[in-house]
Amino acid sequence: MELLNKKILVVGLARTGVAVARFLAARGARVTVTDMKDEAALAPLMEQLADLDIDYELGRHERHSFLMADLVVVSPGVPMDIKPLLLAKAQRRTVISEIELAARFLTAPLVAITGTNGKTTTTTLTGEIFAACGFKTFVGGNIGNPLIELVTSGEAVDRVVVELSSFQLEGIIDFRPQVAVLLNITEDHLDRYATYQEYIDAKLRIFENQTSADYAVLNMDDPLVAAYAGKMKARVVPTSQRQELAQGIFYRNGSIVYRWEGREELFATASFRLKGVHNIDNIMAALASTLLMGCDAGQALAALEAFAGLPHRMEFVREVNGVAWYEDSKGTNVGSVVKSLESFDSGITLIAGGKDKGGEYTPLAGLVKERVGHLILIGEAKERMCNALGSLTDTHLADTLEDAVALAHRLTSPGGVVLFSPACSSFDMFKNYEERGECFKSLVRSLDDGAGR
């Protein structure tokens, strides 16, 4: 792909925009960056590009900038349906995501992972297994480093593993992973998509350019994912916790069984540090991806036994007076919370709520009624959540996370579990889910072991 002297517009600065602008400028492109934020807000990011000849259009998006560009590269946080982008597409301007741009310069085999929940854990674990098997591996995309940074560095790697959001997949054209993974699909980001089907269609684009030489790893326990299995051009590698498979990867009697083209490997899960029923799905997807791409089963098992998981995902904080406290701030949608609740049989005090993302809370109803003894709701969404779930168990509304933790401490009996799994984003009360999770853990760590109930 020739970039020298091409007029290229980068839409949205942030970390990815900086990485894209630096790469393009280094290749001799004539780069303009446009962002709706003003110079004062973007000054720290612009400082990172101060040594480069880049034009800026800030606080606005000018129509002519989009129409005059040879190529438009869109950062993940920018909706693809803003008017200037729609206009550019209508005028046959090439509009792509950073992932599409980077992939055009990659030569190493690529594993791409998407889904509503579990992406980051699966992506990280896949990278860990490849590394344990001796492959020099880049892990990035929607987590960590933008993929374009690998291309910029010129570093030679053996394997590339990327987490992809629906937003990144909206901007692909030729992107083709050798292994594409779809973990699950549940309602999410309905504050950005007009319909649920639009969100589903964006996720499915990960398979769009695959051929029969590639692999599509699909969670067949998810009805929505399974419904699209017959439409794949790639070879389908099914995963399941519920059924034994003639070919694929499945869970049976405390072990994960990988069975593919005459090869069979067994992985006893008792030695895994990563716990939770939902993590079996993530582990199976990571194993399938790596074993298909040349990994040794023994080395893969060693990586699994060493991997403890990631912060803010069903993270055990501490036990206080016989009550176990878990922080799951990354549980930002209903599907994620369902999986977290399924990890415990009963005696749960659930703290949930935050910024409403527009989905339905009723899929939680059965588990709340069956397993949740106390429901404590916070944030912007608490009233709507209360309307959907409040009649099913003992329900309380709290003004702050601090109040919710104190209330959970008083209400939960020894032997019970307090689970903070919001089913909402954090932006009504916190900067991001990480800050929210750290706040929760700090509050739990400050609880008095000897406090009365």
Curated annotation (Swiss-Prot):
Gene Ontology CC: one annotated term: cytoplasm
SUPFAM superfamilies: MurCD N-terminal domain (SSF51984), MurD-like peptide ligases, catalytic domain (SSF53623), MurD-like peptide ligases, peptide-binding domain (SSF53244)
Top-level lineage group: Bacteria
InterPro entries reported in the protein's UniProt record: Mur-like_cat_sf, Mur_ligase_C, Mur_ligase_C_dom_sf, Mur_ligase_cen, MurD
Gene Ontology process terms (BP): cell division; cell wall organization; peptidoglycan biosynthetic process; regulation of cell shape
List of residues binding ATP: 115-121
Function: Cell wall formation. Catalyzes the addition of glutamate to the nucleotide precursor UDP-N-acetylmuramoyl-L-alanine (UMA).
Protein name: UDP-N-acetylmuramoylalanine--D-glutamate ligase
Species for this entry: Geotalea uraniireducens (strain Rf4) (Geobacter uraniireducens)
High-level lineage: Bacteria, Pseudomonadati, Thermodesulfobacteriota, Desulfuromonadia, Geobacterales
